Amino acid sequence: MWKIMRSWKCGGMRWAHRQRPSHELLSQLSFDQHYKIRSNIELLIQDYASKPIAPLNYEYFLQYRPPLTKKEEYMLTIKTINLLLSLTCKRLNAIQRLPYNAVINPHIERTNSLYLKSLQTLLSIAYPYELHNPPKIQAKFTELLDDHEDAIVVLAKGLQEIQSCYPKFQISQFLNFHLKERITMKLLVTHYLSLMAQNKGDTNKRMIGILHRDLPIAQLIKHVSDYVNDICFVKFNTQRTPVLIHPPSQDITFTCIPPILEYIMTEVFKNAFEAQIALGKEHMPIEINLLKPDDDELYLRIRDHGGGITPEVEALMFNYSYSTHTQQSADSESTDLPGEQINNVSGMGFGLPMCKTYLELFGGKIDVQSLLGWGTDVYIKLKGPSKTALLSKK
């Protein structure tokens, strides 16, 4: 089912990858030839965009485990490329269906061009020979990651600029799908690269791609709290905020994707620490309660004493179009908290909505309960793979 065209014929002229610069080739085309090429590209995008994609789950990440055979490497490569092609084309299709005044926005146009470049990178893979050349595939996937590093920031600026003429509900809906598929693409690529590295024996034996078999939760929480404390000290010149973990004597481990939990805890801590600092209560501990009722479920409660959240803010906290922060100046970027450039872009709050997207991707959830004048409790439910799936050998 996997098809990649190395070259194609149009109007008697044959085009091959890396033959000549594209601008030279395009300048020699007649209008009809140019139209046919554009039409073929549109048909390709529509074809891949129409392919159904099963939701990403832990079973996908557990399909292949190091050490991989040559056949497993080959099959993993094909599956990853197929999924990336479909996701890239779905994003291109979604952007092109935006209203005209949105598509011509320079930031949104730049995002569209970025996804076209990603499509070109994926289509440039020579079938079938480069599928058996992991270093080349890894180089192309690394290029994809690098290209999309600031993609959300760029897109958010564009959407912010068209807010006055495009309904906020539709912007939020567009971002929901975009972020979910963007996160899926990143997870697919990083999982592939991690598996290839582990296949050489280069990494932690407790890892299966990006999945950690037994992540020490208290250790990760301490790492994140130390980091956010350091940044708060630089930014606000305040004392360190203590973090208490209950139960203190039990080191709970859980199977999950560490960067996802790290991002979520960073965002929650950022809000909790800043709220307490604003009230002069940085000396009061942030309380963390852990509960693991089953092998594939973990619950966390993060309690702060930052005075709570007003009902007006609480009703909007999961909206992309809402942020409690004003736009920051460029000279403050060196003291931004982790991910803050994404979490607050041109007045658009991305932190909690992205946490929600990450959690719901794998069957988890996040709830916030606030008592105005006192503090806020954040409840996080994490879902992991079942013990049967984790122990099964495929």
Curated annotation (Swiss-Prot):
Family: Belongs to the PDK/BCKDK protein kinase family.
GO terms assigned for molecular function: ATP binding; protein kinase activity; pyruvate dehydrogenase (acetyl-transferring) kinase activity
E.C. number(s) listed in UniProt: 2.7.11.2
Phosphohistidine modification, residue list: H148
Range annotated as the organelle transit peptide: 1-20
Histidine kinase domain: residues covered: 126-386
Quaternary structure, from the entry: Interacts with PKP2.
Keywords: ATP-binding, Kinase, Mitochondrion, Nucleotide-binding, Phosphoprotein, Transferase, Transit peptide
Record Gene3D superfamilies: Alpha-ketoacid/pyruvate dehydrogenase kinase, N-terminal domain, Histidine kinase-like ATPase, C-terminal domain
Organism name: Saccharomyces cerevisiae (strain ATCC 204508 / S288c) (Baker's yeast)
GO cellular-component term (any): mitochondrion
Compartments, as annotated in UniProt: Mitochondrion matrix
Residues reported to bind ATP: 267-274, 304, 323-324, 347-352
Remaining remarks: Present with 4220 molecules/cell in log phase SD medium.
Disulfide bridge positions per record: none
Example of a GO biological process term: protein-containing complex assembly
Protein name (database record): [Pyruvate dehydrogenase (acetyl-transferring)] kinase 1, mitochondrial
UniProt-listed SMART domains: HATPase_c
Enzyme class: transferase
Stated role: Inhibits the mitochondrial pyruvate dehydrogenase complex by phosphorylation of the E1 alpha subunit (PDA1), thus contributing to the regulation of glucose metabolism. Also involved in telomere maintenance.
UniProt catalytic activity: L-seryl-[pyruvate dehydrogenase E1 alpha subunit] + ATP = O-phospho-L-seryl-[pyruvate dehydrogenase E1 alpha subunit] + ADP + H(+)
Source taxon at top rank: Eukaryota
